[in-house]
Design a protein with these regions (language model features):
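Short, small-residue-biased leader/transition segments that mark boundaries at the very start
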Residues: 1-7
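N-terminal periplasmic "start-of-domain" segments of outer-membrane beta-barrel proteins
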Residues: 8-17
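Flexible, glycine-rich terminal cap/loop adjacent to redox cofactors
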Residues: 18-28, 33-133
Length: 133
């Protein structure tokens, strides 16, 4: 069926509602390499994001790590621990569904200051254009 063609288990966000929150989608670096993918990992700490600092100093704990295919810039996975990551993961879910690249993520305009800038920063860092790290 068409629904099963669209459904991909790897594209389902996994969320843990603890303090801090944890969220992931897709493969981590080890899983990508085991699958024979030439992958790289990019990490951005929340302490680099202004909104995380001005909202509450405890919000600046944690990080986001993106796994990207070196050959075609495809976002293979994302792991996050920190403030509101169970909300932030949805942007990556949509981007993966639409076969978006890390560059497209980085060039997407995000409100400033906002926690979602962490994923924009990941996309920029993956392409050597980071602003905050």
């Amino acid at each position: 069926s068409a629904a099963s063609d669209v459904y991909k288990r790897q594209l389902i966000p996994k969320c843990v509602y603890t303090n801090p929150e944890i969220a992931s989608i897709g493969k981590n670096l080890e899983q990508a390499k085991k699958a024979g993918i030439k992958a790289k990992s990019i990490k951005v700490p929340f302490k680099a994001i202004g909104k995380a600092i001005i909202e509450d100093v405890t919000q600046s704990k944690g990080f986001c790590e993106m796994v990207v295919n070196k050959d075609d810039d495809e976002i293979i996975g994302l792991n996050m621990i920190g403030p509101h990551v169970t909300e932030l993961i949805n942007e990556i879910s949509l981007l993966q569904f639409m076969n978006g690249s890390s560059l497209e993520l980085g060039l997407t305009t995000h409100a400033h200051p906002s926690l979602s800038e962490v994923v924009m920063e990941l996309g920029l860092k993956a392409n050597g254009q980071a602003i905050h790290v």
